Amino acid sequence: MQPDFWNDKRAAGVPNEIDLSAYKSVIEVFERSCKTFADRPAFSNMGITLTYAELDRRSAAFAGYLQGHTDLKPGDRIAVQMPNVLHYPIAVFGALRAGLIVVNTNPLYTPREMRHQFKDAGIRALVYLNLFGSRVEEVSKDTEIEYLIEAKMGDFMPAAKGWLINTVVDKVKKMVPAYNLPQAISFKRALHMGAGQALIRHPVTLDDIAVLQYTGGTTGLAKGAMLTHGNLVANMQQVRACMSQLGDDGHPLIKEGQEVMVAPLPLYHIYAFTANCMCMMVSGNHNVLITNPRDIGGFIKELKKWRFTGLLGLNTLFVALMDHPDFKSLDFSHLKLTNSGGTALVKATAERWQQLTGCAIGEGYGLTETSPVASTNPYGGKSKLGTVGIPVPGTAMKVIDDNGAELPLGERGELCIKGPQVMKGYWQQPVATAETLDAEGWLKTGDIAVIDPDGFVRIVDRKKDLIIVSGFNVYPNEIEDVVMAHPAVASCAVIGVPDERTGEAVKLFVVARAQGVSLEELKTYCKANFTGYKVPKHIVLRESLPMTPVGKILRRELRDIA
């Protein structure tokens, strides 16, 4: 379907097109916002707030260090391997201003995963938090990394408090394993060296690569998606357009310089990178960075300090928050936007969230390869639970059969996406690029979807996750959605396993809530809710499920142990 199919289906206030010529690069977006909103808060973390003016100054200092004290050239790759701390936006925007390509790196990567990414991307510089120094020491000698910039948690605090925080993290909590990296320069020292240095402005076009974003690894060895300045600027504008939906007061939902957006999802993940780093910045809004969202008690304690208006999360995080006894004591009176992405939103979770907070969760859909947002639900009562909404402005979608032919509305097939946010390709992987992107620019997602006649898109499942039982198709998401509605189930996952009689059988893994649940209870529940071939033949109770650091359940690992 072409983009104009959705023109009469958008919420009031949401435009059908975006102006792709509005900005020349991510750098221009950043610098314009820092000037326009100079006195407004940009990022807060651990009791410290950076204004846009301070972010501008410190990122310029970091760029000055990179340009004046290293021999890094425009187009060289720099890895940024940090959780949600204030160093992150300073390093990322500083690197971009210096003309470098940013490679977002998960700080929880194993040495094997770090080696793969650093070698594949040809990393020449790495910014990391000292908590991960031992892993950096282990892998740096096997890579081409020449420059190490080491950050510490207390870097932006007053001297005495910063020293205390760094000492507690290292000596008391024992969070810093021993390592020896004498060649590393401290982040604070790099900023000091680069401060006041005139920036050399290298020409940057919308077609130049801004970020190498490695795919999550749920599908095997990670590949680097080449996201250009044009991709990121377009997706920022697309998401901003959706946030311009008119509220009940007749004004745009997201107002410039007035929002407090909570950022528990890691900024190194493309979802939070675009939504928090890019979208909130262009509108002059305030991101509250949550460094460790797994500490739910600490997360809720931080939420109590803010009159937050928006929250980006995903299903597992929403469940963990709602299960905490202090969640109900929070003030949700200002919350007007809750977005879910990264993994399927379970109906029971969405209904419970709205009941407890008064704010509906808007589910969207995206991929690393689409920078990442491809579709979103309208906000409020216009949201359609069980769908991922409609394509963001300027985006076309279609579903195809196994032969590549486009299917009519209402039929399920592989979802394909076309738009200005679609990646340039995979870094140094022309074969993988050709398999994913066709000559007309359509991206094959590998997801099975249905485009309903009203224009809303439903993701049925990943192509490879499809289970075929005696010739019947079983979609894991359907089983998981229903099982999650059981009051004693905290989380679950479904895979297909070989079966001599039926070809494949459904295997269900369940993590129970505190009150527990028996296998017999689950079997009875499934038989009451599913037709015969969908009923799990095998049910396993577990204490936990393997997940990515972002909270996406790794079915691949469950298959390995099945």
Language model segments and positions:
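Conserved AMP-binding/adenylate-forming
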Residues: 22, 45-52, 63-112, 130, ...
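Conserved AMP-binding A3 loop
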Residues: 51-53, 201, 210-237
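Structural core segment of the AMP-binding/adenylate-forming
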Residues: 97-192, 514-515
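AMP-binding/adenylate-forming catalytic core of the ANL superfamily
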Residues: 116, 128-130, 419, 424-425, ...
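Conserved pre-ATP/AMP-binding loop-to-beta segment of ANL
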Residues: 178-214, 221, 246-260
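Conserved AMP-binding/adenylation subdomain of ANL enzymes
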Residues: 233-260, 268-309, 324
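Gly/Ser/Thr-rich phosphate-binding loop
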Residues: 285, 305-312, 322-383, 396
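Conserved ATP/PPi-binding loop(s) of AMP-dependent carboxylate-activating enzymes
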Residues: 390-394, 405-436, 474
